[in-house]
Amino acid sequence: MALVGAGRRPARCVMVLGTSSGAGKSWLCTALCRWYARQGLRVAPFKAQNMSNNARVVAGGEIGSAQYFQALAAGVEPTVQMNPLLLKPEADTRSQVVLLGRVNAELTALPWRTRCAQVWPLLAQTLDALRREYDVIVIEGAGSPAEINLQSSDVVNLRVARHADAACLLVSDIDRGG
Protein backbone atom coordinates (compact mmCIF):
# COMPACT_ATOMS: atom_id res chain seq x y z
CA MET A 1 0.00 0.00 0.00
CA ALA A 2 1.54 3.31 -1.08
CA LEU A 3 1.48 6.27 1.25
CA VAL A 4 -0.16 9.43 -0.06
CA GLY A 5 2.59 11.83 -1.08
CA ALA A 6 5.36 9.26 -0.55
CA GLY A 7 8.54 10.39 -2.27
CA ARG A 8 7.33 13.97 -2.78
CA ARG A 9 8.83 17.01 -1.17
CA PRO A 10 6.55 18.73 1.35
CA ALA A 11 4.30 21.50 0.07
CA ARG A 12 5.53 25.05 0.11
CA CYS A 13 3.75 27.20 2.66
CA VAL A 14 2.72 30.82 2.67
CA MET A 15 1.36 32.28 5.89
CA VAL A 16 -0.83 35.34 6.26
CA LEU A 17 -0.40 37.16 9.57
CA GLY A 18 -2.20 40.33 10.61
CA THR A 19 -1.62 43.35 12.76
CA SER A 20 -4.97 42.67 14.47
CA SER A 21 -8.14 40.65 14.32
CA GLY A 22 -10.28 41.79 11.42
CA ALA A 23 -7.29 42.99 9.36
CA GLY A 24 -8.28 40.91 6.32
CA LYS A 25 -6.33 37.67 6.80
CA SER A 26 -9.25 35.40 5.88
CA TRP A 27 -10.04 37.33 2.71
CA LEU A 28 -6.43 37.34 1.54
CA CYS A 29 -6.09 33.61 2.27
CA THR A 30 -9.24 32.93 0.24
CA ALA A 31 -7.86 34.95 -2.68
CA LEU A 32 -4.49 33.17 -2.48
CA CYS A 33 -6.20 29.76 -2.46
CA ARG A 34 -8.10 30.66 -5.63
CA TRP A 35 -5.01 32.18 -7.29
CA TYR A 36 -2.81 29.15 -6.62
CA ALA A 37 -5.58 26.81 -7.80
CA ARG A 38 -5.87 28.76 -11.05
CA GLN A 39 -2.12 28.30 -11.53
CA GLY A 40 -2.79 24.55 -11.63
CA LEU A 41 -1.43 23.83 -8.15
CA ARG A 42 -3.08 21.61 -5.57
CA VAL A 43 -3.65 24.02 -2.68
CA ALA A 44 -5.21 23.69 0.76
CA PRO A 45 -5.96 26.21 3.50
CA PHE A 46 -4.82 25.68 7.08
CA LYS A 47 -5.58 27.50 10.30
CA ALA A 48 -4.26 25.66 13.34
CA GLN A 49 -6.66 27.32 15.78
CA ASN A 50 -9.75 29.36 15.06
CA MET A 51 -12.02 31.00 17.62
CA SER A 52 -15.48 31.36 16.15
CA ASN A 53 -19.07 30.31 16.53
CA ASN A 54 -19.35 30.40 12.74
CA ALA A 55 -18.66 26.83 11.71
CA ARG A 56 -19.50 24.54 8.80
CA VAL A 57 -20.14 20.82 8.88
CA VAL A 58 -17.78 18.73 6.76
CA ALA A 59 -16.97 15.02 6.61
CA GLY A 60 -15.69 14.15 10.08
CA GLY A 61 -17.13 17.11 11.96
CA GLU A 62 -16.95 20.88 11.79
CA ILE A 63 -14.44 23.59 10.90
CA GLY A 64 -14.41 27.37 10.89
CA SER A 65 -16.41 28.97 8.08
CA ALA A 66 -13.37 30.83 6.74
CA GLN A 67 -11.41 27.62 6.12
CA TYR A 68 -14.50 26.03 4.59
CA PHE A 69 -14.78 28.82 2.02
CA GLN A 70 -11.01 28.90 1.47
CA ALA A 71 -11.12 25.21 0.55
CA LEU A 72 -13.95 25.86 -1.89
CA ALA A 73 -11.92 28.71 -3.42
CA ALA A 74 -9.02 26.25 -3.78
CA GLY A 75 -11.31 23.76 -5.52
CA VAL A 76 -10.84 21.06 -2.89
CA GLU A 77 -13.13 19.31 -0.45
CA PRO A 78 -13.04 20.99 2.99
CA THR A 79 -11.73 18.66 5.71
CA VAL A 80 -11.29 18.85 9.48
CA GLN A 81 -7.51 18.82 8.97
CA MET A 82 -7.74 22.34 7.49
CA ASN A 83 -8.84 23.73 10.88
CA PRO A 84 -7.88 21.10 13.46
CA LEU A 85 -8.62 23.22 16.54
CA LEU A 86 -11.86 25.22 16.68
CA LEU A 87 -12.72 27.12 19.84
CA LYS A 88 -16.40 28.01 20.15
CA PRO A 89 -16.92 30.68 22.82
CA GLU A 90 -19.58 29.78 25.38
CA ALA A 91 -18.93 32.56 27.92
CA ASP A 92 -16.35 35.27 28.60
CA THR A 93 -13.85 32.80 30.01
CA ARG A 94 -14.94 29.46 28.53
CA SER A 95 -14.85 27.93 25.06
CA GLN A 96 -15.97 24.58 23.75
CA VAL A 97 -13.01 22.80 22.15
CA VAL A 98 -13.54 21.08 18.81
CA LEU A 99 -10.51 18.96 17.92
CA LEU A 100 -10.35 17.49 14.42
CA GLY A 101 -14.04 18.16 13.97
CA ARG A 102 -15.33 16.69 17.24
CA VAL A 103 -16.09 18.25 20.62
CA ASN A 104 -13.44 17.27 23.15
CA ALA A 105 -14.84 17.64 26.68
CA GLU A 106 -11.49 16.80 28.30
CA LEU A 107 -9.69 19.67 26.52
CA THR A 108 -12.63 22.01 27.12
CA ALA A 109 -12.12 21.58 30.87
CA LEU A 110 -8.38 22.38 30.80
CA PRO A 111 -6.84 25.82 31.33
CA TRP A 112 -5.90 27.49 28.03
CA ARG A 113 -2.10 27.29 28.41
CA THR A 114 -2.23 23.61 29.41
CA ARG A 115 -4.51 22.90 26.46
CA CYS A 116 -2.10 24.57 24.02
CA ALA A 117 0.83 22.46 25.21
CA GLN A 118 -1.20 19.28 24.76
CA VAL A 119 -2.56 20.04 21.28
CA TRP A 120 0.57 21.42 19.60
CA PRO A 121 1.97 18.00 18.54
CA LEU A 122 -1.33 17.08 16.88
CA LEU A 123 -1.56 20.46 15.12
CA ALA A 124 1.98 20.07 13.76
CA GLN A 125 1.27 16.49 12.59
CA THR A 126 -1.92 17.63 10.87
CA LEU A 127 -0.09 20.38 8.98
CA ASP A 128 2.67 17.95 8.02
CA ALA A 129 0.06 15.52 6.63
CA LEU A 130 -1.48 18.27 4.50
CA ARG A 131 1.99 19.23 3.24
CA ARG A 132 2.47 15.66 1.97
CA GLU A 133 -0.82 15.80 0.06
CA TYR A 134 -0.78 19.26 -1.58
CA ASP A 135 1.60 21.50 -3.55
CA VAL A 136 0.92 24.68 -1.55
CA ILE A 137 -0.56 25.31 1.89
CA VAL A 138 -2.04 28.75 2.59
CA ILE A 139 -1.81 29.22 6.35
CA GLU A 140 -3.87 31.79 8.22
CA GLY A 141 -2.67 33.19 11.52
CA ALA A 142 -4.95 34.59 14.22
CA GLY A 143 -5.14 38.02 15.80
CA SER A 144 -1.66 39.51 15.86
CA PRO A 145 1.65 37.66 16.26
CA ALA A 146 2.95 40.63 18.27
CA GLU A 147 0.86 39.81 21.35
CA ILE A 148 3.81 39.16 23.65
CA ASN A 149 1.62 37.77 26.44
CA LEU A 150 0.50 34.93 24.13
CA GLN A 151 3.84 33.93 22.60
CA SER A 152 4.72 31.27 25.17
CA SER A 153 1.58 29.30 24.33
CA ASP A 154 1.33 30.18 20.63
CA VAL A 155 -0.09 27.40 18.45
CA VAL A 156 -1.40 29.50 15.57
CA ASN A 157 1.07 32.23 14.55
CA LEU A 158 4.88 32.29 14.63
CA ARG A 159 5.26 28.76 15.97
CA VAL A 160 3.33 27.48 12.95
CA ALA A 161 5.34 29.71 10.59
CA ARG A 162 8.62 28.35 11.95
CA HIS A 163 7.40 24.75 11.87
CA ALA A 164 6.31 25.07 8.23
CA ASP A 165 9.26 27.25 7.18
CA ALA A 166 6.56 29.47 5.68
CA ALA A 167 7.01 32.68 3.76
CA CYS A 168 4.96 35.23 5.71
CA LEU A 169 2.79 38.13 4.57
CA LEU A 170 1.60 40.78 7.01
CA VAL A 171 -1.87 42.26 6.50
CA SER A 172 -2.88 45.57 8.01
CA ASP A 173 -6.16 47.49 8.06
CA ILE A 174 -5.54 51.23 7.80
CA ASP A 175 -8.98 51.94 9.29
CA ARG A 176 -7.83 50.18 12.47
CA GLY A 177 -4.60 52.15 12.67
CA GLY A 178 -2.43 50.06 10.36
Please describe what each predicted stretch is.
Residues 2-178:
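Flexible phosphate-sensing "switch/lid" loops adjacent to ATP/NTP-binding sites
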